[in-house]
Amino acid sequence: RSTLMRSSAASDVYKRQSEAELKKRRAAVTEQNKLYDSITEFIRPQLCDLENILKNIENNSGDISVNYAGACVVNVYIKRISNLLIMAKSRKMLNAFELENSIRELAEYISVYGISCSFFSNVSGEISAEKTIALFKFIGIFIRHIMNCTDALLFNLKVHDRFIDLKINCDSKNEMKIPDDLLDDITKLGGNVTTEYDADTLFVFVRMQSGGDDI
């Protein structure tokens, strides 16, 4: 009888452990699905852009090589911003190289698209994950606005002494207004955006502290 009782008790313990493990796994899957849903919502404009480009390719609309190159630019942005969002889920601070490498890869594919694009950088230390995402989103949406109306683009990123300085030079026949909601993403994190337009060139300057507790 005592053997049966011990066996029953062991079975109950195993059952409780299994139920607890199952609940933990379900919670992890639910949390992961929430993260993927939030990422999908974050990149929805770019997903729409990509879908439109692929439709153009399917319908033989426009230059096919330009369409493919444009799809690559959008795809790289989606990949990089998604990676940053995933990393930000578990880390408040990210190595500055994450932002640097994201911009560099994007610049490479912009050049493939046919825009003369240069990227210079000098970075060290860490940047708050929230600001890393805000800055790369700023660049992504900026590119989305100017891709079809510029021939040359230059990015200069400097992260030093607790500050982030991003400079963008863009050949443009018309002065471009930075969307207010894009400015808000930077200013609400304590950053500052200024623009100048001179001799068919748009100059954009973004400055903010690199830490996450200066707001």
Regions found by a protein language model. Name each.
Residues E41-N122:
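Conserved DHp (HisKA) dimerization/phosphotransfer helix of two-component histidine kinases, i.e.
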Residues S2-A10, Y14:
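Single conserved hydrophobic/aromatic residue that forms the stacking wall/gate
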Residues N174-F203:
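ATP phosphate-binding glycine-rich loop and adjacent ATP-lid/helix-beta elements
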